Amino acid sequence: MLLIHANYLDEDFRLVQGDIEIEDGKILRVGKDLPRKEEDLAVDCAGSYTVVPGFVDVHIHGCAGADTCDATREALEAMAAFLLAHGVTSFCPTTMTTSRETIQAALLAAKDMMDHPMEGGARVVGVNMEGPFIAKERKGAQKEEDILPPDFPLFQRFYEKSGGIVRLVDLAPEQPGGLDFVEKASQLCTVSIAHTTADYDQAKAAFDKGVTHATHLFNAMSGLHHRKPGVVGAVFDDSRVRGELICDGFHIHPAVLRAAFRLLGDRALIVSDSMRANGMPEGEAFDLGGQMVTVHHGKELLPDGTIAGSVTNLHQEIKNLVSFGVPFEQAVKAATLLPARAIGLDGEIGSIAPGKRADLVVLDENLDIAAVYH
């Protein structure tokens, strides 16, 4: 199969024109006027279309009425189908702070999806464990009674029983045993600072031990002050660490998003952090890790008004960022290659290059999705 006369983002995320040849689900060649046989299917992408890599969401709890912590294949299939329709071709189902039994069951359900992928859905490429090793003071929408101190032996059991599918684990490194956890867990997967009371110095100590990621930067952590830089300042200051950004316009002000993308560059990645209410009618109440949330004017809220995740998706966030003034190429890269890099899969997915999976999204002149190849 060939996509011909395509405007596409090349592996350096420059907009170029040419053909993309696909064979057996992988990109075989890219370039201008590629030779083709008569029997080859050719899709003409000439005009105002732009081909970009499939989106990669490494932090998503749920959507379409389903949640990772439902711990069933059916829930993950509902999520995968919804995500693919919105251009997400790879994702990490994300657990919350809940019981050990639920976390283990969720990991096993994700493993089943990886071993036996569904047709017509986004691909599960690992799991993100957000909790239970977080700070109660910064729990956000996480359930307090299930919060645990950092416990590497417990995490190792989760990791091994699930066949090593955990790609990201979050924690508050200032908690007792936190730095030891970071040092050991970082040998297995990406470790992220999250839901934390850490100050600048404590965050930097965690980075020195192996933290390379910050979960939903700005949210559930100490902010940037000119005399107390906090976790946000520590991330800005350290080139080893990347930051997730929820770009729905509610979690972070557009002006701050513009500044963050300028400061972080290739260390900024987009996540949805979406919940089961994503794609469902506003005003309905939904369970979120044992707590009830409702959606009002695009915001998902706990009864006390706390923002509880989002109801957005990476495609909408790209459109948001472009409207906020972030360059299109940078926004797409932050939703594709950079999240793939964060979980160590940038050699397989995340950009349009020979040898990578042929996960492609065709956007029209309004940045709406015209087609998804997966």
Sequence positions of predicted segments:
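Active-site loop-to-helix "anion-binding N-cap" substructures in soluble metabolic enzymes
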Residues: 62-71, 92-102, 220-236
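Divalent metal-binding pocket/active-site signature
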Residues: 129, 136-230
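N-terminal metal-binding scaffold of metallo-dependent hydrolase/deaminase domains
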Residues: 1-36, 372
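C-terminal cap of metal-dependent C-N hydrolases
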Residues: 6, 341, 351-374
